[in-house]
Amino acid sequence: MATRFRQTRRRRGHVSMGYGRIGKHRKQRGGRGNAGGQHHRKTWFTTFHPDYFGKHGMRVFHLKANKYYCPSINVDSLWSLVGKDVQEQYKNAKTGEEVPVIDCVKHGYFKVLGKGFLPKQPVIVRARYFSEKAQQKIKAVGGACELTA
């Protein structure tokens, strides 16, 4: 809408001419933007943005999880995963009958090693890896080795 007078004519009599009373139409004496956050605007920053400054820890983006993580268990410790009552329950089981299943991965072990001896009792062992001796000893008592992912 066209007006008859310019703004300067219309604002005569108003002290600040529309530019406010604090800066009075001068440049940024407090700095631009977030300047002075630790100096003359410290109270404002500590009140409304308390964690703006300082260290906040880090994300270790270059560190990979251990790809060689492979906890192992020996053949002589396999029965300790299931307990004595299970061993007694399947004591007289033959190769064709129902035999206990020992899931090593469920108990936190990925690899079965061949140290020690197994009781002469068939058993199915599930793991991600088996050493050759462990496979031989498990099969010698009539058991089986199952690879899991």
Curated annotation (Swiss-Prot):
Q: Where in the cell is it found?
A: Cytoplasm, Cytosol; Cytoplasm; Endoplasmic reticulum
Domain of life, source organism: Eukaryota
The record's GO CC annotations read: cytosolic large ribosomal subunit; endoplasmic reticulum
Q: Which GO terms describe its biological process?
A: translation
The record's function comment reads: Component of the large ribosomal subunit. The ribosome is a large ribonucleoprotein complex responsible for the synthesis of proteins in the cell.
Return the similarity comment.
Belongs to the universal ribosomal protein uL15 family.
What is known about its subunit structure?
Component of the large ribosomal subunit.
What protein name does the entry list?
Large ribosomal subunit protein uL15C
Q: Which species expresses this protein natively?
A: Entamoeba histolytica (strain ATCC 30459 / HM-1:IMSS / ABRM)
